Amino acid sequence: MEKIVIRIAKFEDEKLVHNLCQRNGLAGEISNQAWNWIWKDNSFYTEAWPIGWVLESNNIIVGYIGNIPRAYIFNGQTWIAGVARSFVVDLEYRRYSLQLISEFFQQKEADLFIFSSANNLSSSIYKMVKAKPIPQDSFDTDLFWIVSPTSFIYSLLRKKRVPKSLSLLISYLIAPFVMFENLVRNRWPKSENFDVEISTPKMLTTEIDKLWHQIKANNPNKFLSYRDRDSILWQYDNDSVKNRNPLIFTLMKNNVALGYLIVVEMNSIEFGLKRIVIDDLIVYDNDPTSINFSERSFFL
């Protein structure tokens, strides 16, 4: 007789959960023992914090939802969010999905819950439990800056299942029109008042901490994720993310940090597309001139 059990995940479950993710089309973490840095190296993790829950059928893991503690600040108070990760259930056991996610919602340690990487399948479950999307109309809209038009168009057509030969032909025909856009990028206004320092996460200085203190002091009524140097190092200086070569573009004026932009590689092996993604961007007072200069420094 089949025995279904939901229990708190253990660090020893990492390999089995990784296998679960892979057989359900989720990449999972690139490095071994990724759970160590996700939780044990996390400043806001405690032994009382559940790292997630697993769904077992006869002692075989067939479902999982992770639970990462992330710090936010609002009205001068620190809030610890339970951030869901890798919510996945084998197809034949998805009738237990609500029971699994209910364990996540019943935890007592988190002040709020965040689902930052929901796909179409998991988002339908989140909606059933009344989770709300963030109040920003374009939060799920992707913007592209095309560097190699031929490769980009070819990859896009292949993703749409257009035959290889036809994709190649169309990409060469359309590429010149896209390249024209590249020629007019310099229409962005230039500014000599800013400097940009390019660094790896470990090279960050305490100027980032000064910037963070200014931002949170000037925005007490905004719900902000922690962006001090330690938080950035935790997120970007680990074996898993190092494979994506994170770089930080720090916007400086008179030797004072006014903002930063973090980029990582997210190449698509399946479609042969090389991609660099803006993973984080913040500037003092959300100044449009600073934002434009930061983006321009990266793109150009």
Segments from the language model and where they lie:
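A conserved beta-strand-loop-helix scaffold within acyl/acetyltransferase catalytic domains
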Residues: 4-87, 196-283
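Acyltransferase donor/substrate-recognition loop-hinge adjacent to the catalytic core
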Residues: 1-4, 12, 132-222
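Generic intrinsically disordered, low-complexity segments enriched for polar/acidic and small residues
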Residues: 32, 61, 90, 101, ...
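Acyl-donor binding region in acyl/amide transferases
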Residues: 73-156, 266-300
